[in-house]
Amino acid sequence: QAYVQLADETALKITGNYLDWLSFLTTASRLYKYPYHDQLMIYAQRPDASACAAYELWNGTMHRYIRRGAKGIALLNPTANGMRIRYVFDVSDTGTRADSRNVDVWQLTEAAEPAVRKMLAEEFSADASMRLVQQIEQLAERQALAYWNEHRRDILDSVDDSALSEYDDFAAGASFRKAAAASISAVIQT
């Protein structure tokens, strides 16, 4: 129950303040393999986390051990019988052995930028003449628009008590798309 409350409080906090939202997005950018609700729980407990996994993955696949005294990060999994808690650990909670695998956190290098720009142009029809940052922003705007078009009714039905509730449908859509595009772009560029 305490973890459900933590999730609710954290969601209110990050959606109520721009700087808190950016801080959350920074954490989310490192944890892109996790869904939003897991990213939210990780942010609430360990905003500095950079690479999280279950005990079994660290110990088995990665041949790393969890340091004594390390506190797991609780994640909530809804089941038919209510909420189930599972734990993950950040790489900073682990230690190495002789046969440990390295944890390489992916980063875009300057040398790889031309290849990434070319791939974005070929695979996603991004404007090849744009800089990488501009391509990312262009694609983020497209994704935000596509999401809005697909989920417009659901979004408009859920905006009570939010800033969007004061807008007509057109203005709410424009505001949502702008915020979503900025968030997508921020996560990718962080």
Residue ranges of model-derived segments:
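N-terminal accessory/interface modules of nucleic-acid-binding and processing proteins
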Residues: 1-190
